[in-house]
C-alpha cells in the first residue's frame, strides 16, 4: 500500500483523538521508510499533541536537518510552522532558532535561506536579513527579489559602496534587469565616478525592449544629462535631456535641470521658461523648482514676477540653499529693493 495513504490514515486517527492508533501507523511507515518526510512530520505533530516537547523538537530536527529531504518539503514544513506560530501568537524566537539550526548546515539550494530572509524582514529584523540574503544571491545569482531587498537595505543606510557591490554581479547574472543599472548609476554618481555612470547608462539602454517603461528610459537619459553637465560637455548634456523628454515629457528632474542650465548660459530662455513652468505646476512648493523659474524670469528681465517666485522659494525652505539666497538678493536688487538685496548678499 502507498505509504502516503498510510500517513494520511494516521493523521485521521490523530485528529480524532486515537493517538495510539496514529502512533502505530506512523511507526509502521517509518520502519519501512525511515526518511519518509510526511511520516516524520506527522510523528512530530504526535509528540506535540501528547506534550512531549523535547521529542517534538528532535523529530523536527530529524526532518529539517535531513539531507535526503528535499528543499521543497523543508520549505513547506517551515511555512506550516510559521503559520502555526503566528496563529498561536507566539514570539518568533522558536522559528528563528529552527531556521538557525538549518542554516548551520551547508546550503546548496536558495529556498530555505530566502524563506528565512523573508521571515526576518516580516519581523522588522532588516540587519539580520542581510547576510541571509547575501547567501541567497550567492546560491542563485538570478534571484532578483533577494538582490532588490539587499539594495533596499543599502539605500536606507546610504551605503553606496554596498549598492555597487550588490548591483555589479546582478547585472552580470541578469543583463536585462534595468533596475540594477539604475541603482548602480546612482551609486557611481554618489561616488563621483562619472565615466562609470555614463558607461552603466549606455549599457542599460542597450537592453531596452518594446516592453520597457518609457519613464525608465527617460530616467537613464536624464542621469546622463546631469553627468555630461558636470563634465562641462553641454552639447551632449542637452542632447541627453532632449532624449529624456522624448520618452517622458513630464520628467520633472530633467525639465528642471535642463531649464536651469539653459538659464545659466542665457540661451533658449523661452524654452527654459516653458519647461520650468511645468515643474512649478507639478510641485508648487518645491523651492528648487521655484528658484529655477524665478531665475529664468530674472534672466528675461521680468523682475517683478521673478520676485513673486523667489519669495515662494524662500518660504519653502529656500533659505537653506546658498544659491537660492544669492538669487534672492540679485532679484531684490533689480526690483529696486537694495536694502533687501544687501540682507541676502551678506
Tell me the role of every PLM-derived stretch.
Residues 1-336:
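Alpha-solenoid helical repeat scaffolds
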Residues 338-345:
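Leucine-rich solenoid repeat scaffolds
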